Amino acid sequence: ISALFDEYEPLNDAD
């Protein structure tokens, strides 16, 4: 998910 939400990762706190 970090790849998609690289600039916006609030849900993606783990990765």
Swiss-Prot record:
Stimulates synthesis of ecdysteroid in the testes of larvae and pupae. This is Testis ecdysiotropin peptide A. It comes from Lymantria dispar (Gypsy moth).
